[in-house]
Amino acid sequence: MMHLLFALLLSALPCWVWAQACSDEARAHVSTLAEQIRQWDDSYHRLGQSPVSDELYDQARQRLAQWHQCFPAPTATPNTPLASSRGAQPHPVAHTGLEKLLDEHAVDAWLGTRKDVWIQPKVDGVAVTLVYQQGRLRQVISRGDGVMGHDWSASARKIPGIVQQLPDPIDLVLQGELYWRLDDHVQSASGGLNARSKVAGLMNRKHLGDTDAAGIGLFVWAWPQGPAAFTERLSTLKRWGFTDTQRFSQPIRNISEAAHWRAYWYGHPLPFASDGVVLHQAQHAPAERWQVSTPYWAAAWKYPTTKALALVRDVQFKIGRTGRITPMLELEPVRLDDRQISRVSAGSLKRWQSLDIRPGDHVSISLAGQVIPRLDEVILRSSTRADLPVPNPGKFHALSCWQLDPGCEEQLLARLSWLSGNQGLALPHIGRETWSVLIQAGLIAGFLDWLTLDTAELANIDGFGDRTRARVVDSFHSARQRPFAQWLKALGVPPAARNNLEGDWQTLVARDTQAWLAIDGIGPGRAAQLSAFFRDPHVQALAETLRVAGIDGF
């Protein structure tokens, strides 16, 4: 079923998306991703640990399915996520899986072919089978591989949240989720808090203490041989003591009602962690026909994605005006909160070095403040560690790259963009693109070369028509009328001096570190920066150029 779903999804993708998914780079990473998913499966199902969030895991599986579509391997071993968790105890009724509906359109389509549907939170815990004989709890079996699990009966008998004796002497099989009790837990604000791993770890112990046992609850989500009417199932379960099921079950008729409850449970307090909602059709197959596969009568709709798994295509190093080096990760485009993300900052050179991110790695990204893409962590490393042209941080600083020396284009371009921006001279019609064109045309090799450009020199630049040339030249000429204080900002004077300026350039140059320290609000570090700036030979040469050009204050 899932194979068919992925095939349908891929067939609907635009050609450019298919090309990216089936790139040569992807071919090299198929086996690495498959092995990582196998390890995650083993940790999750056998050890009860979640080394990666569910949403990143789901995306990794989806990506692997895409790549297998691109690069089929006839001899590949089928992937069985639950294989390592198989136990020795057979389930009386198999545990089915859940089809994961990707969006509202998929949910709407699913609802359109079903009736008498109910919705519940998708409790983030560990699945179990409960077997009652003559009303007494006889056995609790971990999910395992869905057919065979582990006997957790001894620990289960210590858990107050599990009904030990039913009021009716009935033989009964239930399926549900053991969860860790949380007080007023809001999933959208707090996430999963590793609640599932905690329960799994406790249940896998040889001895479960009373305090830990009291922290475990039970949510029954299936009564395979129960009455046909969903309402009767709920009321009976409540009468027997399984109160969560009725409390957190709602009938729905359409996508609007499904979306309402999904948003409500995501943003309102619950006594457990959850990672989405589950849609149940009241009518289901007879219990003896249940299999470890996705059934037609139930499906999951996960909560909104807060993280995206992204493949790194390249790492570029941007050098800013002050010489700060910022590694930028170029990504295979991914969607996050209805936005397409194709690049993200690694923050600082030091952080990039500590993470050691290379092309071919998979990283987790999220949105800071729901707006700015943010790098979280490396999820999977490529076995091939590509060499990268990492800039030497010792060569770039606040006083480097006033000219187009080797390796200086990035910083010089950043300086010019600052100069023409609102924080500098506020030159109309002049931005980073304009400066880049002028540099590529060979008309600018130094910070102030543009001061003497005229219309004739701009005549041979492709894309510069008469109107553009006239606007650029007029903007450059207007710079000569800017006041001295504005020019100082454009040059990049350290900020502490901008509101404490008295006198012209010569007055400022004459101040040494002690003189700067005497000004209120300027500490030793800033004083040293100011002194170094005004005494730097390159800066003094720029000041002389501005003096000759007749700029105020120089």
From Swiss-Prot:
EC number: 6.5.1.2
Protein family: Belongs to the NAD-dependent DNA ligase family. LigB subfamily.
Name of the top EC class for this enzyme: ligase
A Pfam cross-reference name: DNA_ligase_aden
Function: Catalyzes the formation of phosphodiester linkages between 5'-phosphoryl and 3'-hydroxyl groups in double-stranded DNA using NAD as a coenzyme and as the energy source for the reaction.
GO biological process, one term: DNA replication
Reaction(s) the record says it catalyses: NAD(+) + (deoxyribonucleotide)n-3'-hydroxyl + 5'-phospho-(deoxyribonucleotide)m = (deoxyribonucleotide)n+m + AMP + beta-nicotinamide D-nucleotide
Entry protein name: DNA ligase B
UniProt-annotated catalytic positions: K122 (n6-amp-lysine intermediate)
Species in which this protein is naturally found: Pseudomonas fluorescens (strain SBW25)
Coiled coil: none
